[in-house]
């Protein structure tokens, strides 16, 4: 514990003791006697010795301006409740927000299972003590494999954006190429993460979309594919909601050039949509948040990566893969890591890519959700979402000056509403709706300025006819 707490030591002696309230009650290591004992334990002469390798220009030269501490639990609780009371949650307001985090029904059993003490950790587990967790994650992988019609699915990575970045780097390693084509309808936030993952050695180039259908522009794609192209990455449905029925053509184009087809998909759509593996995808990735997870922002949603069971793909997974095998006892099976030597946990500084296990718990949650729903349940949810989204789009377009930004787009649960002819900004419409406790869609005017005043609306199985009618009347 003493060694782990060294990160809390502050250079320059004990600046916290110089504050008018003395030693900070939340930072035990600010006590001079505690610091001295820790330094003796590791044989260091001073706190400064611990930071000798850090250049002077990067060190903080002054005391941290921390706020006055709240000394009692009652004061702290009251302060936090006051801060949080400034928020309006989706429990209080009617939400049509999506764009990467959407509101779906979370069956009570999902929360019940993921809060059990034997599962309640973000970590994936250890082979000698976590057989139950390994089995649960193996079951998740199997269920996702069935949903995606793919052979291999990883233990969840941090989120869908990391899964996308990792899938692209896998494709680059497999092909030995450095040119990546990405659809320009990808979320600006996700594209930033992809660029960050790839900026050291890969070149990201965007492919235009059709302004009427929202689909990938095949002519532009053909002109940009070359023998240096490692992969084409597109999303189906896209961030802007459009379903692309050209998946097979896109995959054929990149395959002819010797590259890899990567498709990101919303897993809850697969009860009614064909999985990407059916139209040529080599790597399928995405976010499992719709599968039994509450909306949240600031933590891992859980991302998945799926491929065929081919060595050239499996060897490039940086994340953990769990398998099943017979034990020495007849009729008994064990669950454990496959090809562990390819992971960053084994290769450390020589690994191809680093990955953590911060979202493994969500894999168990998604496994519970999928086992509860089954194929028929997923189909029912998909059909319900389709019907409700179509009704919402139709009702909104009945308003004066309101239309679909992509009039010929096929969409699943999200669609772009064009407010340009209303003479009002999305920001002003959102503000008016918020006063009525309604979140009216994601403002696209910054991320996609070419669309002008447009908003991305998300409708799922939780929305009722009355909910849709309410937002329409409020906008009117």
PLM region descriptions:
Residues 1-15:
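Short, Lys/Arg-enriched N-terminal segments with co-localized hydrophobic residues
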Residues 13-31, 38:
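Charged, compositionally biased N-terminal leader segments and the immediate start
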Residues 24-28, 40, 66-70, 130, ...:
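Hydrophobic alpha-helical scaffolding
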Residues 26-27, 162-334, 401, 417, ...:
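Conserved PLP-enzyme active-site core in the AAT-like
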Residues 52-139:
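N-terminal entrance/gating region of PLP-dependent enzymes' catalytic architecture
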Residues 127-129, 145-165:
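Short loop-beta-helix segment that forms the pyridoxal 5′-phosphate
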Residues 291-400, 404-408:
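Active-site C-terminal subdomain of aminotransferase-like
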Residues 376-470:
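Conserved C-terminal alpha-helix-loop-beta "cap" of PLP-dependent enzymes
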């Amino acid at each position: 514990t003493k060694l782990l707490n060294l990160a809390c030591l502050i250079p320059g002696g004990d600046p916290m003791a110089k504050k008018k309230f003395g030693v900070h009650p939340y930072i035990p290591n600010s006590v001079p006697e505690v610091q001295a004992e820790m330094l003796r334990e590791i044989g260091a002469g001073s706190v400064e010795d611990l930071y000798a390798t850090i250049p002077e220009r990067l060190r903080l030269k002054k005391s941290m301006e921390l706020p006055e501490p709240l000394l009692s639990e009652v004061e702290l609780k009251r302060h936090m409740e006051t801060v949080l009371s400034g928020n309006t949650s989706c429990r209080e307001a009617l939400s049509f927000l999506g764009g990467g985090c959407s509101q779906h029904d979370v069956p009570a059993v999902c929360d019940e299972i993921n809060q059990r003490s034997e599962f309640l950790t973000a970590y994936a587990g250890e082979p000698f003590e976590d057989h139950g967790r390994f089995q649960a994650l193996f079951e998740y992988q199997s269920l996702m494999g069935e949903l995606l019609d793919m052979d291999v699915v990883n233990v969840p990575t941090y989120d869908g954006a990391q899964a996308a970045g990792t899938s692209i780097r896998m494709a680059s390693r497999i092909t030995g190429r450095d040119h990546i084509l990405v659809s320009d309808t990808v979320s600006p936030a996700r594209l930033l993460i992809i660029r960050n993952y790839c900026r050291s050695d890969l070149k990201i180039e965007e492919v235009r979309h059709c302004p009427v259908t929202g689909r990938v522009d095949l002519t532009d794609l053909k002109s940009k594919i070359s023998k240096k192209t490692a992969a084409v990455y597109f999303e189906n449905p896209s961030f802007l909601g459009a379903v692309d029925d050209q998946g097979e053509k896109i995959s054929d184009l990149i395959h002819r050039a010797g590259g890899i087809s990567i498709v990101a998909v919303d897993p809850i759509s697969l009860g009614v949509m064909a999985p990407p593996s059916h139209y040529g995808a080599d790597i399928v990735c995405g976010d499992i948040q719709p599968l039994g997870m509450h909306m949240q922002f600031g933590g891992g949603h859980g991302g998945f990566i799926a491929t065929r069971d081919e060595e050239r793909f499996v060897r490039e997974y940086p994340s953990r893969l769990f398998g099943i095998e017979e034990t020495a006892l007849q009729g008994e099976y064990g669950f454990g890591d496959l090809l562990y030597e390819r992971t960053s946990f084994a290769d450390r500084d020589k690994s191809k890519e680093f990955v953590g296990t911060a979202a493994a718990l969500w894999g168990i949650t998604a496994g519970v959700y999928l086992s509860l729903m089954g194929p028929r349940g997923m189909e029912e949810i998909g059909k319900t979402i389709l019907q409700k989204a179509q009704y919402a789009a139709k009702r909104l377009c009945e308003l004066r000056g309101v239309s679909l930004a992509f009039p010929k787009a096929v969409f699943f649960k999200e669609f772009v509403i064009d407010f340009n002819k209303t003479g009002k900004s999305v920001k002003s419409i959102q503000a008016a709706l918020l006063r009525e406790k309604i979140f009216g869609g994601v403002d696209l005017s910054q991320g996609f300025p070419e669309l002008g005043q447009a908003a991305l609306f998300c409708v799922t199985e939780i929305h009722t006819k009355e909910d849709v009618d309410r937002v329409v009347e409020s906008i009117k």
